[in-house]
From Swiss-Prot:
The keyword Endoplasmic reticulum does not apply. Residues 47-54, 121-139, 218-237, 293-308 are cytoplasmic. The keyword Glycoprotein applies. Keywords: Cell membrane, Disulfide bond, G-protein coupled receptor, Glycoprotein, Membrane, Olfaction, Receptor, Sensory transduction, Transducer, Transmembrane, Transmembrane helix. PROSITE patterns: G_PROTEIN_RECEP_F1_1, G_PROTEIN_RECEP_F1_2. Belongs to the G-protein coupled receptor 1 family. One of its GO terms (cellular component) is plasma membrane. The chain crosses the membrane at residues 26-46, 55-75, 100-120, 140-160, 197-217, 238-258, 272-292. This is Olfactory receptor 5K1. Residues 1-25, 76-99, 161-196, 259-271 are extracellular. It comes from Homo sapiens. CDD domains: 7tmA_OR5H-like (cd15409).
Length: 308
């Protein structure tokens, strides 16, 4: 009996979205289609950038890594979610929870820094085009990309490590479609104040620094666009920036709501819509927002299709 109770403390049940059979089938089809489009779209973009020397520039190196991160995000969350739609055993161990959150936190943190790097790259290209190759060298690009993944790993290690200081002795039902860290805090029998404080400080710092970099870069870009004499060039540049900024706003807005709001352990029912945005919707939209509006990518795709 003691062993069974101990097991219960370290296993959780993901309640997911709904228990209605009709809705389960519909949601499964929708999320499976989104998953396929997300993975195929992002991996295709990575392959396209990797195999064509014409795209081996800082802008596309960042874009390729962003696509890789988005596909990893989908793979970390969606398979288990799809399995749970029809599985009677929706259990997940504490260690599986830790692994799932580790990968999610790593890729989302890397995503933040990559978006900041991409915004800086566009700032240099539009505001200082003559100095682009000096200010945005391949060496700096590689350093920024590597730094994004190192920061992601360190950030996730801190939070995952602190999870193991908690004790779970009450309910083991997680009202979520994946094992996020906030529901674990709510189930803890030990006061998670330290975990909550560390999450607020580190997540807040990452997001404030990266969104600040993005906003400053886009502010300078907009000022430069408004100074353009060509109305056509101004409209094209503004249209591209607007679509990029929409993706950034959805991503950062949902992350801020999830992890940087006051009283993190309250309002658990509102976590799921925000989580859907940054784990499912944004990875789906990014390859289309960043590539289908890009002349270089479209040009390479046309050449490939013409050869076939």
């Amino acid at each position: 009996m003691a062993e069974e109770n101990h097991t219960m403390k370290n296993e959780f049940i993901l309640t997911g979205f709904t228990d209605h059979p009709e809705l389960k089938t519909l949601l499964f089809v929708v999320f499976f289609a989104i998953y396929l489009i997300t993975v195929v779209g992002n991996i295709s973009l990575v392959a396209l950038i990797f195999t064509h020397r014409r795209l081996h520039t800082p802008m596309y190196i960042f874009l390729g890594n962003l696509a890789l991160v988005d596909s990893c995000c989908a793979c970390a969350i969606t398979p288990k979610m799809l399995e749970n739609f029809f599985s009677e055993n929706k259990r997940i161990s504490l260690y599986e929870c830790a692994v799932q959150f580790y990968f999610l936190c790593t890729v989302e943190t890397a995503d933040c820094f990559l978006l900041a790097a991409m915004a800086y790259d566009r700032y240099v290209a539009i505001c200082n085009p003559l100095q682009y190759h000096i200010m945005m060298s391949k060496k700096l690009c590689i350093q920024m990309t590597t730094g994004a993944f190192i920061a992601g790993n360190l950030h996730s290690m801190i939070h995952v490590g602190l999870v193991f200081r908690l004790v779970f002795c009450g309910s083991n039902h997680i009202n979520h479609f994946y094992c996020d860290i906030l529901p674990l805090y709510r189930l803890s029998c030990v006061d998670p104040y330290i975990n909550e404080l560390v999450l607020f400080i580190f997540s807040g710092s990452v997001q404030v620094f990266t969104i600040g970099s993005v906003l400053i870069s886009y502010l300078y870009i907009l000022l430069t666009i408004f100074k353009m004499k060509s109305k056509e060039g101004r409209a094209k540049a503004f249209s591209t920036c607007a679509s990029h900024f929409l993706s950034v706003s959805l991503f950062y807005g949902s992350l801020f709501f999830m992890y940087v709001r006051p009283n993190l352990l309250e309002e658990g029912d509102k976590d799921i819509p925000a989580a859907i945005l940054f784990t499912i919707v944004v990875p789906l939209l990014n390859p289309f927002i960043y590539s289908l509006r890009n002349r270089e990518v479209i040009s390479v795709l046309r050449k490939i299709l013409m050869k076939k």
